[in-house]
A protein has these predicted regions:
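AlphaC helix of the protein kinase catalytic domain
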Residues: 120-131
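C-terminal lobe helix-coil module of Hanks-type protein kinase domains
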Residues: 198-294
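Activation-segment/catalytic-loop signature of the eukaryotic protein kinase fold
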Residues: 101
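AlphaC helix of the eukaryotic protein kinase fold
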Residues: 58-89
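Activation segment signature within eukaryotic-like protein kinase domains
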Residues: 139-140
């Protein structure tokens, strides 16, 4: 009998790991807390289980929802392995380490360390006021640096948002949801499009649109603005119809340094060609402003405006 997208029961053995509990569910995966039976370490396991394509059979096997979806499920599973293999080759303090990946139950599993800390989205919900400039720089400069490494290796994350940023001790950030990461030179599987309202730019809503590092840049800008205002920006499709979003440099003037507001506005340009081409471009533009900010010589908004961002 095929069941709906049911999680595996606590105590289930998958490879060399014993599952403890489900700790998350996404559009394409189930996430478990588990124990490594060889080392005793606590780990996090992501199971490839796209809710629009897959069902669970008795015994734990993952099968397509219908015969028509078999090819898409197979293709998605193959891409899952290719993408995890690519990520395993990257080493960065803000990119989660891949400990293991394997095939079981006719699907793929990704094993990661269980990092202690808190989720940025949850942290924002608990705060009564906005966050400081220092906090934003501590979190998002390393995130941009991690994305820059991915972009240099022709990979894009495609789902950067506060809910996918984990804060460790000292607010050291860790990018989560590696299952959304996609190599630029590979075709996207049907049903694999990730869209998060408020953080996904307009090109991400259309299957034939070209995605690239600039797609991640928009999401970073939207995430920073969420931290500043404690609310999610309007969805890109709404902005495409009628852009009522007031620029950050106008809406938040005096609350944050001009250079940071300009960076947010540049990153959140509706047209991809008007954004920084990748995370490195935005980071390179930010660096001299960061140096001046840390020494107390903060530039004004007018002086710091990047090319392509118009004053309103």
């Amino acid at each position: 009998m095929a069941l709906a997208r049911q999680s595996l029961s606590p105590g289930t053995l998958v490879g060399a790991y014993q599952l403890a509990e489900v700790i998350g569910k996404g559009g394409f995966s189930l996430i478990y807390l588990a124990h490594d039976l060889d080392t005793g370490a606590e780990v996090v396991i992501k199971e490839y289980m796209p809710k629009k394509l897959a069902r669970r059979r008795d015994g734990g096997r993952v099968v397509p929802m219908s015969a028509e979806q078999a090819l898409s499920l197979h293709h998605g599973r193959r891409l899952f392995f290719q993408e995890v293999q690519a990520l395993a080759s990257l080493s960065h303090p803000s990119i989660v380490r891949v400990l293991d990946f394997f095939l079981a139950n006719d699907t793929g599993y990704l094993v990661m360390p269980n990092e202690r800390g808190r989720n940025l989205s949850g942290y924002l919900q608990q705060r009564r006021g906005g966050v400081s400039t220092t906090f934003l720089l501590d979190v998002f400069v390393p995130v941009l640096d991690a994305l820059a490494l991915m972009h240099r290796h022709a990979m894009v994350h495609l789902d950067v948002k506060p809910g996918n940023i984990h804060l460790r001790h000292g607010n050291q950030p860790l990018l989560l949801d590696l299952g959304a990461v996609h190599p630029l030179n590979r075709e996207r599987a049907r049903g694999s499009q990730v869209v998060t309202a408020g953080y996904s730019p307009v090109e991400q809503y259309f299957s034939r649109a070209e995605l690239g590092p600039w797609t991640d840049v928009y999401a970073v800008g939207a995430s920073i603005r969420t931290c500043m205002e404690r609310k999610t920006p309007p969805p890109a499709l709404e902005r495409k119809k009628e852009d009522t979003l007031v620029s950050a440099r106008e809406a938040l003037a005096g609350r944050y340094p001009g250079f940071l507001l300009e960076a947010v506005d540049w990153a959140m340009q509706m047209e991809a060609a008007r954004r920084p081409r990748d995370a490195s471009a935005l980071l390179d533009w930010l660096r001299p402003h960061l140096d001046r900010y840390r020494t107390g010589a903060v530039t004004s908004a007018a002086d710091s405006r990047p090319t392509g961002v118009e004053a309103h």
